[in-house]
Amino acid sequence: MRAKDFLNELVVAAYRLKGGYVTIPVRGQSIAISVDHLRTLKRAKTYSVKEPDTLDWLDSFEPGSCYFDIGANIGQYSLYPAKKFGDKISVYAFEPQSNNYYALNKNIYLNGLGENILSYCVAVSGKSEFSKLYIPKFIPGGNRSQFGREDIENMKISATHVQGMFGVTLD
């Protein structure tokens, strides 16, 4: 086992002893994030500082707003507005990568937001079709997956896993 893999397993095991998640304060909201991999822990720890403009935009929602989180990953930017605004807004989270979709739903559950966020394991695309999802890092919290074709320029590395996927338009 590589040292990096061993460290990952050790950190995840330590968090499992503490319930399997970390609670992060984000602009006055206490949000639980499942720790199934070092990547999800990193996403949790950088949550409130990585995309301040996104959080500013989410803060601007008003009652009756409808939010589509396309490429929701593990759900950080679905959880925050759902927690802040509750049933005053509608949140729809779309995440095609199976590891992330599992983590997204786990985070929805940990935060008691099952009535506030509807999640869908589909790729939002320019057309509705069956195709493949090319995944460069098949880990919870992984990103840069590409639907329909392997795009090395955007993925940065070749796919380590290819997953069957249905793509949908939101028209």
State where each predicted segment sits.
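Conserved sequence/structural motifs within the catalytic ATP-binding
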Residues: S128-F130, G164-G167
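Polar, low-complexity loop segments and adjacent catalytic/binding residues used for recognizing
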Residues: F130-F138
